[in-house]
Curated annotation (Swiss-Prot):
K(+) binds at N233, T252, V254, T257. Its main location: cytoplasm. This is tRNA modification GTPase MnmE. The gene is mnmE. Belongs to the TRAFAC class TrmE-Era-EngA-EngB-Septin-like GTPase superfamily. TrmE GTPase family. It comes from the Bacteria. GTP binds at residues 233-238, 252-258, 277-280. The lineage of its organism: Bacteria, Bacillati, Bacillota, Clostridia, Peptostreptococcales.
Amino acid sequence: MYIDDTIAAIATAPGEAGIGIVRISGEKAIELIDKIFKSKDHKVLSQYKSRRITYGHIIDPKTEKVVDEVLVSYMKGPNTYTREDIVEINCHGGMIPVKNILELVLRVGARMAEPGEFTKRAFLNGRIDLAQAEAIMDLISAKTEKGFDVALSQLEGSLSKKVAKVREKLLDMLAHVEVSIDFAEDDVDEVALDYLLNKSLEVEGDIQKLLDTADTGKIIREGLSTVIVGKPNVGKSSLLNALVRESRAIVTDVPGTTRDIIEEHLNIKGIPLRLIDTAGIRDTEDIVEKIGVERSKELFNLADLIIVMLDASRELTEEDLRIIELIENKRALVIINKTDLQQKLNLTPIQEIIQDKKIIKVSLIEEIGLEEIEDALAEMVYKGGAKAKDSLLVTNVRHKNALERALDSIIDGTKAIEQKLPLDFVEVDIKNSWKALGEITGDTVEEDIIDHIFKNFCIGK
């Protein structure tokens, strides 16, 4: 990438809209816009002060034809998104005007921006670190208010500041180690070793606290793949419709009605769920239904959360028990439906298999128990880990991997101190931990990883 050239891209989503925006960033931004913009006073933009919006027209310099009526804003660096000069052209929405203006900007000397290049320049120019850059993408793709809040907190530097504090502790440890190595002819005194050991254990705790939020953070960021399973006609489709609050699945008294997979995205108490209603699991000779059953089993194995539906009005069968046995080691919730009918289901064998799983009795037709289901789902996600109110969550798999490597290294360092191994060994472990943490903020990350991260951004951001 050439950081000294000027880039341009459409910054708004494609399609019809009230406004479309073409963004330009670089040292020649004002020079390029002067070639194609004329204000109502027949002035070029460089004649106006920075940080104001100017009304006028984009003019094709070859034909002198008006391309569109626009509002243009000019922001002089370094106090801009990229820390470079930025020009934004607000034109009429729709593909034709924004496409024509972008083509004109490129024709007079700008280069088409790569995906995420504006944000990448903000990172390379030191306005934000890598964790903050990734938070911008999370803000755009947030599925819930909680996801948005966590991403905004990360953009404001909550994670970066915490990581920086831990790295400072590691640097302090390195300084003590290097001083001791410089005076290697003297034995390292117990006071110095005690100090290093206490610091090392403190860093372990700091990193572990961050890692403890990672499972919840991943769910907040990416959503929870939730599969509803059970025999045919137990109420799986009714549950999907009740949670979505509209009729998405066909509900009949005929077993095997749902033959395909029905998927809905919804937000339950701040948790983004990808809720999947599957074909009823049973032995069948129907070819189409059989395919649906096989797909149900595949999704069952891949799901983050399983909701098992049972019918309170029917006796427990071997088929039910086989399904229950499958969830023994999974995050799962058991729902007993049709409690408004005569009860025939014996819960004792179920409770013996899944002693730690929550069982909720509901009547979906009477709309009884739905709130309890939603509360149970939220409790299962947040149980034992980060709470919904927490803003500092590790949501990114890349960050989690870096933290795990940092923790492994400092644990090795702690062991080396306890065993009174040569301090050169301790130094290597501390440095490895420090470097791993630096990957989160981009201080010690490889260039190809940076390129990969920004390729996932949209063009114009």
